[in-house]
Every structure is written in structure tokens, then in C-alpha cells.
Curated annotation (Swiss-Prot):
Belongs to the SecA family. HAMAP family: SecA. The keyword ATP-binding applies. It is an enzyme of class 7 (translocase). It comes from the Bacteria. It catalyses: ATP + H2O + cellular proteinSide 1 = ADP + phosphate + cellular proteinSide 2. PROSITE patterns: SECA (PS01312), SECA_MOTOR_DEAD (PS51196). Part of the Sec protein translocase complex. Interacts with the SecYEG preprotein conducting channel. Has a central role in coupling the hydrolysis of ATP to the transfer of proteins into and across the cell membrane, serving as an ATP-driven molecular motor driving the stepwise translocation of polypeptide chains across the membrane. This is Protein translocase subunit SecA. Transmembrane segments: none annotated. It comes from Aster yellows witches'-broom phytoplasma (strain AYWB). ATP binds at Q85, G103, E104, G105, K106, T107, D495. It is a peripheral membrane protein.
């Protein structure tokens, strides 16, 4: 282990040493670049772009490009990037993570690698955690730096229409949020008009701000485009009515994992309540699903901690557990959101199914090069390396850190802890020192707020309930006498600047109300103080009644704290390295567990990723192709050849003419397509291979039908383009129809696959095998349905106008028994699965 850590440490030092060599080359060009006139910068950019096209690499262009960007930043913003910011910029260009402490200028640092990589003509996306930050950089002086350099800059936010998004994505540099970027990707892969695509270039390079928040904290939260499903409102209400009758003996909560299940006594009670024999019978699967969601909603989900209730608009709002922000428009999936609505007595909205989905883990791995910035990534460097192939390189601060980080104060009860917190806060507030109080939940922030009101201490609250005032509150948090309560470091991404005279008072004082599951979040809170060499102070107040202690320490930690207080000089508060280490050990355990869980989920999600890429790549080829007729013909030929071959090999008499005609006309062709005498002649000709002959004959029928359909449009020049559009539209709609069903099938498979462990089988291997079977079955159905729909479709009747009306596809839900049984066999998937 020591050798492994030593190797990592040495590799980090080596990367920094190489970065210094490059940064020195940048500095050597500063005097030369400073002689340029303002108008020369855009000219220089054009020259560098030309050099790249002529064969120069970005690494070769880096020193001059960075020197230009640095001088441009100085002229436009009045701020000169420090040497350490050049180091960070080099690390970003190399596709790694630059860990830069709060206030060290990550915003300016990103300009240099963004400018350099945009010289290639490929898209550069600078990704922020919220729209406020994206707009601030685009509209402000940072965007002006790029414009000064002759680069185009775009902004991508959810209020932009399709045309605005298309223009933004064509810019050299795009400022965007992670969520909007991901949803645009999903929406693009549901488009049926190529002209509507917003991202028409490859995903080349992304710089992710607060990279740990997006790629670690939000990794488990998939982006989902939903569709309405069959209503089951009454089941939600009945399930909620049932759980309200339960006592502690009826259910069991696992605190560490926050899972809940009915006990045997609870199962019996459910069966009596719903008047059924066996809750776990397959016929009661929907009821069981609703009961489980009702249990989660009632006993593991807490208002003002996991979600907010907006009674005015009658809706449940998710609280981001890592930022404390509300997430309007987002829903808990799989019916949990509706269960919470039932719990809170709100109108139950329609449950949704998945139309398209992707996780941030898999979305950001689409980029050819990925880099990121944050003040807190070192604790998660193993995950960044394993999942994203990025190293975390600590960038030294420009000025030494002088913040004082005091040991934790520890208490037995929450009351003792809060009393001590208010005591210290009051003492510091009296001398005018600004104070930032960090909480882990909205609920705790409001408890602290009530206590401050009792002491007549004016303060601001920054949590999910008032996130709209975030920038305004943070801007004032460093002023004299300011007291700010922030949940899970809401306000991250905006510096807290000290007001006049605050340095003399000791700078910003940060008081944490408890330890978070992740050391990173604690470090983010501490990092709000002591920016750029400013003085600062931080201390955490923890108790044995804190959630982290309750989940992992139990009564053991309470006994330890009680013992320490007895031997301490203070009656209540005391500090102990042993207890601090104990909590740190818990945090490491949770972090390791969360990492393992994210890896576990990623392993499953990678199966869907491979399938999604196959579908989306083939779909896009069809969408943008101007040769869709040829694509469709090739697909039909292979589909028919396969079907005919299967029919021949399954028949004792290989060419039963009437049976063959009936089979093909039922499955693919319009009635009376085939002539019985012609088919008999083909089958009975001793000089030819009847299988090959009939395959060629049937494909000629395909070409004849397609030509007759096309002839209908050729008669009217205004409608000539509709034939190709019609083929494309039908093909894409069928792909989407089946793929969306497949996503939900895979979701159901994932939820149910855990039960195979009872049969001593590996659940992942079983998921992989059955997922491949589902995928191959879907591919076959897509090919069959495209062939049948187009051959049987009457363009003359239905395509008098462009194809905007709904086409009703063949219902393929009535599978034969063999396809209903999931089989485990090796499945091969290709880049063009149905070709």
C-alpha cells in the first residue's frame, strides 16, 4: 500500500514538474506578446489556426497560445493570471484535474486551455454547475477575453430555443451546465429531422468546473427524458393508507444503506390489509412495487432534508444532497415521486416511463478529452483515475494558506452542540467577524435560524428554499457582521470576498454543524475561508446524535464522548483527536462504500451504454443520410434473406410454396404480392438453388413495391422529397418505439435480477446475458417491423402531406412462447445491428 501511495505521489510531482517546464516557456514569450496591438490578437488566432491545419500539434502551439490568452486576459479584465494558474492550465490541457483551492482563480485558468483547444476547430465546452455561473462568464469579461482573441462564444441554458442552441453549439467555446448538455444529447438522439439537431460536431473537449460535484456526487443520478404511463393513482393512495397503519415491528430499516423492507409480521399485515394470499405472487408485482415506494416515502425520505414541498404549486421538489439546491423539473424515478405526493397529500401526477436516459459517468466519457477543476478532488483520486482516466494534480497556492483549522468540538447531545455553536457564534459576531455556518440539511439550517432569531442576530439563509438569492447572499457573506447559514455549501462556485476591515478581525469564520458523509464537502466548507492568503478560521461541532454517528457509531461513540467530557476541563464541549479520527474513519468507510457502489452501478450501466451507442450511431447514420433508400433496401434484403432461410431450414420439404407465400405475406408483404405459379417454378427448377432463387425473387418484389411507392411522388415535383422523408421517418419512429420499450425492459430486468442470487448465480453475469437476449430480440423486431411497415404502407393514401401524423406500427407485444422465456446464450452485437 505504501509503495502504491508513493507511486501516486511521485507521479503527481512528476506531472507538476513537467507543467513547470511548459509554464516557463509561456512566461518567456510574455514580453514579446505584450508589444502587440489589440487588433493583432484576432490575427494571431487566425495564424495559429492555420498552423494547426498545416500539421502543427496543439502541444507545439501551447506556449504562444497561452501567452496570447494570458495577455488578452490582462487587457480585458485587468487581472494577470498567476504562474500557478498557468500550471493549472497546462494540467487541464493534458486531460487531468487541477485541484486549485478556493480563490485561486479557476475561472481565469480555464481560458488558456479552452482557447488552445478551440484552435483545432473542434468544440470546447466549459461546464458549470448552474446557469448563473455560465451566464456570468458568457456575458461578462471572461467571454470578452475570447471575443478579444477572435473566438466566438456561446451560452447554452434551458431557456434557449432550438435555433439559439444550434448557434451556441457552433461557437468555438460554449458555456453550459452539465444537465443541459446531457439533456441536449438525449433530445438530439430522439430527433427525426437532421436540421433540428443542436450538437452537430463531435464531443471533443470539455473543461468541467467543480468536477467532483458533477462526476462524483451526481454520478448516480441519471438524466432521464420521461413519458407518461398508465395511471395507478389509487394504488399510491392505498399503499400510503397501508403504511400509516404500520408499527416498528412491521418493517426493518438498514441505517447504513437506508433501505427498508417489510418483516414477516409486516408481510402478513399487508396480505390481510389488501385481502390477498401472497404479496410476492407475480400477479401482485405492481402492488408490491407501490408498497415498497410507500415504505421508502414514509420512513426513509424526510421533508426539508431529501425533498421540499411547495404547497403553493402543489409539488414535491428534490433537494440535491450535495449542493442543498432544489431541482425544479426533476422527479424521483420509478414511482417514488408519486409516493411522496401521496404521503404529503398532494395531487398525484402521472407516473412516467423512461424515453431516454444516460448517467453523467457515461455522458462525459463520450468526450475525446476531459478535464476538470475543483478545490477538493484528492480524496477521490482513485475514482477519477479508474472511471475517467484522469489524474488529480494539486496546484500550489499563489500565496501560502494561513487559515486556522481548529479541532472538532464534540458533544453527547444535539442540544449541547447547538448551545455551544451559538455561544461561539455570538462571541465572534460581537466583534463584527463575518460567520458562515454550514449545515447538512434544510431542516438543520432552519433550527439554527430559529436559535439566532431568539438571540436577535440578523442572518441570511442559503438553502433549497431560497436558492434564487444565492449570488446576492454569497456576495455579502464576507462583510462585517454578516452571518450566513448555507446548506451543503450552497453557493459553491462563487467566491466570498472579505469586506473592509475584516482581515483585521481574523477573516471569515466557518462553523460546521456536523460532519458530512464526504470529507470533500467538509473541505469545501472550510475552503470558503482563507482564500488567496486571507486570514480565516474553521471548526466543526459534532455530537453522538448526528446522523453520521447514529448510522455508523451507535452507542459506542456516545460512551466515548461521555467519558472524554468527564475527564475534560469543560462541562460540555471538548475536543479529541481520537474522536476526530473516528469520524474521519467513518467518512473514509462511507466514501469507499459509495465508490464501490458507483463502480457497481457503472458495470451494469455499461451494458446499456454499449447498446445505446449501437442504436444511436445507427440512428444518426439514418437521420443525416441522403441515401436512406439504399439503407432501407439493404436492411430489407438481409431481413428477408434471414426469414426465408429460417423458413426453409425449418421445413422438411424445403420449398412448400403455398406455406411460403402465406408466411411472407402475413409477416412482410401486402396480400397477393406473390404469384403461386412463379413460386412453384422457382422451387421446382432442378438447375437452380431454390433458396437463392427465391431470396432474389422476393427482393425483386421489394424493389418493385418501393419503386411503385416512389412513382407516386415523382408525378408531383412538389412532393418528390416526401418519399425519402417518409422512409426515414418510419424507420426512425420504429427504432425509437422499440428502443424506448427496451430501456424500460432493461430497467425492469435490473430491478428483478437480484433475485437470481438466491439460485447461486452471479446477478451481473445473468443481467449481461439476459440483457443481450433482450437487445438481440429488439434488433430482430426493429428490422422485421421496418420491413413490414414500409412494404405494407400506402404512401398514396397517407402521405398527401409531409409525414406529421402518427403511423401505427405492427403490435409486436404478442410474442410467441419461446420469445417470452428469457434464454441465456452468447449474443453478438455489431455497429449496424439490423444490417
Amino acid at each position: 500500500m505504501f509503495n502504491f501511495l508513493k507511486k501516486i505521489f511521485n507521479s503527481s510531482k512528476k506531472a507538476l514538474r513537467k507543467a513547470r517546464t511548459i509554464a516557463n516557456k509561456v512566461q518567456n514569450l510574455e514580453a514579446q506578446i505584450a508589444l502587440l496591438d489589440d487588433k493583432d490578437f484576432a490575427t494571431k488566432t487566425a495564424e495559429l489556426k492555420k498552423l494547426f491545419q498545416e500539421g502543427k500539434t496543439l502541444n507545439q502551439l501551447l506556449p504562444e497560445a497561452y501567452a496570447l490568452a494570458k495577455e488578452a486576459t490582462k487587457r480585458v479584465t485587468g487581472l494577470t493570471p498567476y504562474y500557478v494558474q498557468i500550471l493549472g492550465a497546462v494540467i487541464l490541457h493534458q486531460g487531468n484535474i487541477a485541484e486549485m483551492k478556493t480563490g485561486e482563480g479557476k475561472t481565469l485558468t480555464a481560458i488558456m486551455p479552452a482557447y488552445l483547444n478551440a484552435l483545432s476547430g473542434n468544440a470546447v465546452h466549459i461546464v458549470t454547475v448552474n446557469e448563473y455561473l455560465a451566464k456570468r462568464e458568457f456575458e461578462g469579461s471572461i467571454g470578452d477575453v475570447f471575443r478579444f482573441l477572435g473566438m466566438t462564444v456561446g451560452l447554452n441554458t434551458k431557456d434557449k430555443d432550438q435555433t439559439q442552441k444550434q448557434q451556441a453549439y457552433l461557437c468555438d467555446v460554449l458555456y453550459t451546465t452539465n444537465s443541459e448538455l446531457g439533456f441536449d444529447y438525449l433530445r438530439d438522439n430522439m430527433e427525426i429531422e437532421a436540421s433540428n439537431l443542436v450538437m452537430k460536431r463531435p464531443y471533443s473537449y470539455a473543461i468541467v468546473d467543480e468536477v467532483d460535484s458533477i462526476l462524483i456526487d451526481e454520478a448516480r443520478t441519471p438524466l432521464i427524458i420521461s413519458q407518461s404511463v398508465k395511471e395507478t393513482k389509487n394504488l399510491y393512495k392505498e399503499a400510503q393508507r397501508f403504511v400509516r397503519t404500520l408499527k416498528n415491528s412491521h418493517y426493518l430499516i438498514e441505517l447504513e444503506t437506508k433501505t427498508i423492507e417489510l418483516t414477516e409480521e409486516g408481510i402478513t399485515k399487508a396480505e390481510n390489509f389488501f385481502q390477498i394470499d401472497n404479496l410476492y405472487n407475480i400477479e401482485h408485482a405492481s402492488l408490491l412495487h407501490h408498497v415498497k415506494n410507500a415504505l421508502k416515502a414514509a420512513f426513509t425520505m424526510h421533508k426539508d432534508k431529501d425533498y421540499l414541498v411547495d404547497y403553493k404549486d402543489g409539488q414535491v421538489l428534490i433537494i440535491d444532497q450535495f449542493t442543498g439546491r432544489a431541482l425544479p423539473g426533476r422527479q424521483f424515478s420509478d414511482g417514488l415521486h408519486q409516493a411522496l405526493e401521496a404521503k404529503e397529500g398532494l395531487l398525484i401526477k402521472k407516473e412516467t416511463s423512461i424515453g431516454a436516459t444516460i448517467t453523467y459517468q457515461n455522458f462525459f466519457r463520450l468526450y475525446q478529452k476531459l478535464s476538470g477543476m475543483t478545490g477538493t478532488a484528492k480524496t477521490e483520486e482513485d475514482e477519477f483515475r479508474d472511471i475517467y482516466n484522469m489524474e488529480v494534480i494539486e496546484i500550489p497556492t499563489n500565496v501560502p494558506m494561513i487559515r486556522i483549522d481548529e479541532p472538532d468540538f464534540i458533544f453527547v447531545s444535539l442540544k449541547e452542540k447547538y448551545d455551544a455553536l451559538i455561544e461561539e457564534l455570538t462571541s465572534r459576531h460581537k466583534k463584527g467577524q463575518p460567520i458562515l455556518i454550514g449545515t447538512t440539511t434544510v431542516e438543520v439550517s432552519e433550527i439554527i435560524s430559529k436559535k439566532l432569531k431568539k438571540h436577535s442576530i440578523k442572518h441570511e439563509i442559503l438553502n433549497a428554499k431560497n436558492h434564487s438569492k444565492e449570488a446576492e447572499i454569497i456576495a455579502k457573506a464576507g462583510l462585517k457582521n454578516a452571518v450566513t447559514i448555507a446548506t451543503n455549501m450552497a453557493g459553491r462556485g462563487t467566491d466570498i470576498r472579505l469586506g473592509e476591515g475584516v482581515k483585521e478581525l481574523g477573516g471569515l469564520s466557518v462553523l460546521g454543524t456536523e460532519r458530512h458523509e464526504s470529507r470533500r464537502i467538509d473541505n469545501q466548507l472550510r475552503g470558503r475561508a482563507g482564500r488567496q492568503g486571507d486570514p480565516g478560521y474553521s471548526r466543526f461541532f459534532i455530537s453522538s446524535e448526528d446522523e453520521l454517528a447514529q448510522r455508523f457509531g451507535g452507542t459506542r461513540i456516545e460512551k466515548i464522548i461521555s467519558l472524554l467530557q468527564k475527564i475534560s476541563d469543560s462541562e460540555t464541549k471538548t475536543s479529541s483527536k481520537m474522536v476526530t479520527k473516528f469520524f474521519t474513519k467513518i467518512q473514509k468507510k462511507v466514501e469507499s462504500s459509495n465508490f464501490d457502489y458507483r463502480k457497481y452501478l457503472l458495470k451494469y450501466d455499461d451494458i446499456l451504454r454499449i447498446q445505446r451507442e449501437i442504436i444511436y450511431n445507427q440512428r444518426k447514420e439514418i437521420l443525416v443520410s441522403d441515401k436512406v433508400e439504399q439503407i432501407v433496401q439493404d436492411l430489407m434484403k438481409k431481413t428477408l434473406n434471414k426469414a426465408i432461410f429460417t423458413h426453409f431450414t425449418n421445413k422438411p420439404n424445403k420449398c412448400q410454396t403455398q406455406a411460403l407465400i402465406t408466411f411472407l405475406e402475413n409477416k412482410f408483404f401486402p396480400k397477393q404480392t406473390f404469384d403461386l405459379e412463379e413460386v412453384q417454378e422457382l422451387c421446382n427448377n432442378p438447375k437452380t438453388n431454390s433458396l437463392d432463387s427465391f431470396q432474389q425473387y422476393s427482393f425483386q418484389k421489394v424493389k418493385d413495391i418501393l419503386q411503385s411507392q416512389k412513382d407516386f411522388f415523382v408525378k408531383d415535383p412538389e412532393k418528390a422529397q416526401y418519399f425519402a422523408k417518409g422512409l426515414k421517418w418510419i424507420t426512425l419512429k420504429i427504432i425509437d418505439n422499440y428502443y424506448q420499450r427496451h430501456i424500460n425492459d432493461m430497467s425492469s430486468l435490473r430491478q428483478g435480477i437480484g433475485f437470481v442470487s438466491y439460485g447461486q448465480q452471479d446477478s451481473f453475469i445473468e443481467y449481461q446475458k439476459e440483457g443481450q437476449v433482450l437487445f438481440n430480440n429488439m434488433i430482430t423486431k426493429i428490422a422485421n417491423d421496418i420491413t413490414a411497415t414500409i412494404l405494407k404502407f400506402s404512401f398514396a393514401d397517407s402521405f398527401q402531406t409531409p409525414p406529421k401524423q402518427k403511423v401505427f406500427f405492427k403490435n409486436d407485444s404478442s410474442d410467441d412462447e419461446s420469445s417470452k422465456k428469457r434464454r441465456t446464450r452468447k449474443v453478438r452485437t455489431s455497429k449496424k445491428p439490423w444490417n
